[in-house]
Amino acid sequence: MQLKTALLFATPCDDEEDDMATLCCHSDQGQMFLLTRYPDEDTVDLTLDDEPSTLDGLKVTLWADRLLIEVAAGDSDALRGDDFLEILHSTPAGDLAEVELTLRNILQGTGVFVSEV
């Protein structure tokens, strides 16, 4: 599955939401992607449009223009039958550090994060 978006929106620690880390985007086709985690939880919430899933064991790889989210085969229903979601993005280079920090916060202890930025 693939989405194209102009920007990845990242919040590494939202004080107003009990320190929840959030990464989200809206595709050029109007689809919404949301990846969140509260610091005291052992799982990650992934929402695609209006379909939420609770997952662990995600692998996420970030490039300057691409984000790849890989799920276990048993969790492919979260991505409508696919085992990965590729998001092509045009996030400004100056904002990628915040995206990286957010992904580290989301995946720490629950998954794998690889930065190729």
Regions found by a protein language model. Name each.
Residues 1-63:
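The feature represents the first ordered module of a protein
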Residues 2, 46-48, 76, 80, ...:
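Residue-level signal for well-ordered alpha-helical segments
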Residues 28-29, 52, 75-77, 93-95:
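Residues that cap or initiate secondary-structure elements
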Residues 33-42, 78-92:
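Extended Gly/Ser/Thr-rich low-complexity repeat segments
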Residues 41-44, 54-55, 65, 87-91, ...:
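Short, low-complexity, polar/charged sequence segments that are solvent-exposed and flexible
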Residues 57, 61-77:
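A short, structured beta-strand/loop element
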Residues 81-117:
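Mixed-charge, glycine-accented linear interaction segment located at domain edges/termini
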